[in-house]
Amino acid sequence: LTLGKSLTPFPKDANDFYHITKANDSLFARAACRNWNLKIIDVMQSTVFGVETESTKQINEFTRFDYDEIYGTVLNRFILQASANLPLTIYGGGKQSSGIMVLRDAINVLNKLKDFDIHSGSYQVINNNPKSYKILDLAQKVKNAFDARGKDTVFNTTDFDPRNESKNNSNI
């Protein structure tokens, strides 16, 4: 399936349990459109980082901050590791790339889509991946930001890759 300039595997493919659930969600949504004449827009977004939007700044509320030690949210993991004075762990050499976008940009795209008109029984996929970064470059950006604030941040680079990906994988 070609959408604009990007090639999207269809049916979706995944190599870990989390992303398999995402692929299944899309298949279920598509079946619901066919069977019950629903309108569904499936938004595929980059990894989202950040904790505030224009709305939350005005009412002094917080959004959630997700991270884990292996899957996804690599930028958040680096920020937490640096905050805790831990080395930034870079799996597989850091040449892999990942799409990253700021929370407020993700919200802006979703707000624009609320008026997107599709017909009943239609399933539309929107890919929102504005920019990709090498994992090592993200780690360097976090290191630079924390070093500028007086924290001596170091890397822990390991060949071990818990996601079992190619060291040069550009499709994270």
Protein language model features and the residues they cover:
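Short, flexible, mixed-charge acidic loops at enzyme active sites
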Residues: 1-3, 55-59, 168-171
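Active-site Tyr-X1-5-Lys
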Residues: 1-46, 74-84
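Conserved donor sugar-nucleotide recognition element shared by glycan-biosynthetic enzymes
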Residues: 25, 71-74, 135, 168
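C-terminal substrate-binding subdomain of Rossmann-fold SDR/epimerase-dehydratase oxidoreductases
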Residues: 82-172
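Active-site pre-Tyr helix/loop in NAD(P)-dependent dehydrogenases
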Residues: 6, 46-51, 96-97, 131
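Short, function-defining helix-loop hinge/capping sites that tune catalysis or transport
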Residues: 30, 52-55, 135
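Glycine/proline-rich active-site loop of Rossmann-fold NAD(P)-dependent oxidoreductases
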Residues: 23, 36-38, 48-76, 86, ...
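Residue-level signature of the cytosolic catalytic core of signaling kinases
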Residues: 13, 67-71, 131
